[in-house]
């Protein structure tokens, strides 16, 4: 699924608040997963969206991870400014208390 010589990977980790919007952490994690998976097919160059939940309960773990692949840095930029992605970010501002991201090229 690699296009040309570039494949961009965008990985984001979140730690979630115990509750937000009247929902518990697990409910908000599931809602986040649904919102992120719904981005598939909406952005040209977005190849893959995968969302997982941590089961380790390590003290340094995050509850939710997004793994996504893009055909180019430009495709990642289109994703970042897509209106649906902007809505997710706004929603997340109340749900998460920590975010870590890594973008890299292979």
Region annotations inferred by a language model:
Residues 1-62, 71-78, 104-106:
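Short S/T/G/P-rich N-terminal loop/turn motif that feeds into the first structured element of a domain
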Residues 51, 88, 100:
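Glycine-rich, flexible loop/turn motifs
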Residues 70-95:
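C-terminal structural segments of small proteins and small subunits
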């Amino acid at each position: 699924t690699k296009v040309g010589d570039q494949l961009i990977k965008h990985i984001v980790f979140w730690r979630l608040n115990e509750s937000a919007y009247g929902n518990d952490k697990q409910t908000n994690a599931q809602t986040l997963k649904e919102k992120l998976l719904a981005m598939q097919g909406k952005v040209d160059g977005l190849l893959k969206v995968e969302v997982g939940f941590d089961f380790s309960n390590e003290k340094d773990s995050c509850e939710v991870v997004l793994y996504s692949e893009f055909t180019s840095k430009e495709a990642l930029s289109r994703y970042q400014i897509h209106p649906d992605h902007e809505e997710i970010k706004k929603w997340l501002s109340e749900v998460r208390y920590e975010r870590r991201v890594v973008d890299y090229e292979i």
